[in-house]
Amino acid sequence: MLVDLDEILVSLKEGRHIPEETVYALCMDSQELLMNESNVARVDTPVTICGDIHGQLHDLLTLFEKSGGVEKTRYVFLGDFVDRGFYSLESFLLLLVYKLRYPDRITLIRGNHETRQITKVYGFYDEVMRKYGNSNVWRYCCEVFDYLSLGAIINDSIFCVHGGLSPDITTLNEIRAIDRKQEVPHEGGMCDLLWSDPDEVDTWSMSPRGAGFLFGKGEVDEFLHVNNVDLIARAHQLVMEGYKEMFDGGLVTVWSAPNYCYRCGNVAAVLKIEDNLERKYTIFEAVQAQNGVGNTIIPTKKAQMDYFL
């Protein structure tokens, strides 16, 4: 089926329903494109790094507006496109359409929410059922999740990943060797990349999330040295100020969902890496609710645990 990407873009931005067969075609085309990308995608500067989106479509549109737009800016998205917010489908499809339209300008990395198990609990599955009356569209999207890269490397100097490091992974080549085209395992290197968090710890420690590890400055310094990189850019954790540098600037957390869960009151940020590797942060706030569109509260059918907050 031939799809008109520009027409779909307009429909997504206006919040119109996307037919199931159109979603299927988009997902099939996206899989075909993504399967040829490396586990660690290569990206050139200048580039803008974006953190979690979590279905906040109107804030995603603001992100593009504030950072130049995909027509003239290169982007790396660090995962967690879905769940929590009420426009997970539209947010993910918007990014897929941009990926298909401008394949060299958008790099999409898998987050811990881009899995079947997590989306069943945290909103995406229920959203699709509410909008379509069946789970087909959810299944199509989950198949695309399996093809997303696990990381990116910018100018051989900045390693991008959703969560963090793993005791099972020392080098980027070990990440490149992973068979990524699967549901995220409950443990091991692939799991840790999507689930781990930096913390003030002396060595690898158990994560309170129940998956991944906590890692400290020593682990970051070692990874930077062994792989000859200067920075780890990751997302995965809410930062009230939008971004947070740690470990003498060797790691940064970027968070791009303002007023997360429509109640946290945080600002969001994106990080632009210039050709000389200079870092420039852009801060933005949530879209205000207007005419029932934007940062509005919509009741969900099922109570959701808050352990990601």
UniProtKB/Swiss-Prot annotation:
Gene3D superfamilies: 3.60.21.10
Location(s) in or outside the cell: Cytoplasm; Nucleus
CDD domains: MPP_PP2A_PP4_PP6
Record function comment: Forms the histone H2A phosphatase complex in association with the regulatory subunits PSY2 and PSY4, which dephosphorylates H2AS128ph (gamma-H2A) that has been displaced from sites of DNA lesions in the double-stranded DNA break repair process. Dephosphorylation is necessary for efficient recovery from the DNA damage checkpoint.
Entry cofactors: Mn(2+)
Reaction equation(s) it catalyzes: O-phospho-L-seryl-[protein] + H2O = L-seryl-[protein] + phosphate; O-phospho-L-threonyl-[protein] + H2O = L-threonyl-[protein] + phosphate
BP GO annotations: double-strand break repair via homologous recombination; meiotic recombination checkpoint signaling; negative regulation of DNA damage checkpoint; negative regulation of glucose mediated signaling pathway; positive regulation of double-strand break repair via nonhomologous end joining; regulation of TORC1 signaling
Cited SMART domains: PP2Ac (SM00156)
Top class in the EC scheme: hydrolase
GO molecular function ontology, one term from the record: protein serine/threonine phosphatase activity
UniProt EC number: 3.1.3.16
Family membership: Belongs to the PPP phosphatase family. PP-4 (PP-X) subfamily.
Cofactor remark from the record: Binds 2 manganese ions per subunit.
Active site (catalytic residues): H113 (proton donor)
GO-annotated cellular components: cytoplasm; nuclear periphery; protein phosphatase 4 complex
Domain of life: Eukaryota
Binding site for Mn(2+) 1: D52, H54, D80
Residue numbers binding Mn(2+) 2: D80, N112, H162, H236
This protein's record includes keyword Transit peptide: no
Positions of post-translational Leucine methyl ester modification: L309
Protein name, as recorded: Serine/threonine-protein phosphatase 4 catalytic subunit
Subunit structure: Catalytic subunit of the histone H2A phosphatase complex (HTP-C) containing PPH3, PSY2 and PSY4.
Keywords, ordered alphabetically: Cytoplasm, Hydrolase, Manganese, Metal-binding, Methylation, Nucleus, Protein phosphatase
